[in-house]
UniProtKB/Swiss-Prot annotation:
Substrate binds at residues 51-53, 94, 199, 250-251. The active site is at 240 (proton donor). It catalyses: 5-(methylsulfanyl)-alpha-D-ribose 1-phosphate = 5-(methylsulfanyl)-D-ribulose 1-phosphate. The record marks 160 as: Transition state stabilizer. One of its GO terms (biological process) is L-methionine salvage from methylthioadenosine. Its EC number is 5.3.1.23. One of its GO terms (molecular function) is S-methyl-5-thioribose-1-phosphate isomerase activity. This is Methylthioribose-1-phosphate isomerase. PANTHER family: METHYLTHIORIBOSE-1-PHOSPHATE ISOMERASE. HAMAP family: Salvage_MtnA (MF_01678). The keyword Isomerase applies. The lineage of its organism: Bacteria, Bacillati, Bacillota, Bacilli, Bacillales. Homodimer. InterPro entries: IF-2B-related, IF-M1Pi, IF_2B-like_C, Initiation_fac_2B_a/b/d, M1Pi_N, NagB/RpiA_transferase-like. The gene is mtnA.
Amino acid sequence: MAEPFAIPRSVEWNDTHITILNQQKLPLVTEYLELKNIEDVWDAIAALKVRGAPAIGITAAYGLALSAQQYETESLEKFKEHVRKDRDYLASSRPTAVNLFWALDRLVSSIAHVSSVNEAKTTLIHEAIRIQIEDEDVCRRIGEHALSLFQNGDRVLTICNAGSIATARYGTALAPFYLAKEKGMNLHVYASETRPVLQGARLTTWELMQAGVDVTLITDNMAAQTIKAKNITAVIVGADRIAANGDTANKIGTFGLALLAKAFGIPFYVAAPLSTIDLATKTGEEIPIEERNPEEVTHIAGTRIAPEGVNVYNPAFDVTPHDLITAIITEKGIVRGNYETELPALFAKEARHEAI
């Protein structure tokens, strides 16, 4: 049996550079890239070399810290202005993932009261490292809460990749499957391929197989038949942004799975950290939806599969209405139904815990 957690980390800090697992090359090639400046970091995020909301946040935090180390000035005011400009630059790399803004803003806030440039540089590194350490703990706790919703032998459908390589470790939607493996429970995962970038086919199946988790790959248009024929007991997905009312932006195709779950009468779960919940965004209507390069649809592995000049609509995300979501699973617990009241309460609980 494979070691359940023998899974490559997606991001590492190495003092003079950031090392990332190039998720664009998986599963055929396991390639690690060295990001040596802020432009490398921006490109890695925008080009999906690193992806998954928490991993994006971690990488951006390290990118901000790295750029700060490379900026030479004795003026603390000029240094902070440089950090703020870098923050805005990195924030432009992916407009939907709220973890990106959360991590960058956390680093900017961490140097609000420093007294020197050297102190600011050290603080930024420590804060970025802290974000990664905290995310690993958060993901494990999400997995423990999620696992309480499953029984031995359950067959669970997921989309995209909300796994270990999308986070610091364990993942969000995939975390319960690693913990089930650890505890000797048998859960079978059905992974939707996730067109057009194929994160489910390339990434989810790859990392689950590395850990010896039972996984079956399906194409996106097989979901309804799979739920019916394979007796799927639940759907679990990650999230890139959750609005205050529970509306959830996630990889394109998630909304369709939620509709299918409702039609078949099975639970539809969203697993995400508190940092993905954006209380300033009241509903899903306010969430910007990134539209990506048409070639992601018209080409596969560099080969054109559609006529030259065809019109293409390529949204990277869709928004699942809150009334289709059975529960939102966070590190602080499971929220069901009354999201406008219960989601803010999670943050109040977090604030009380930090004050103790």
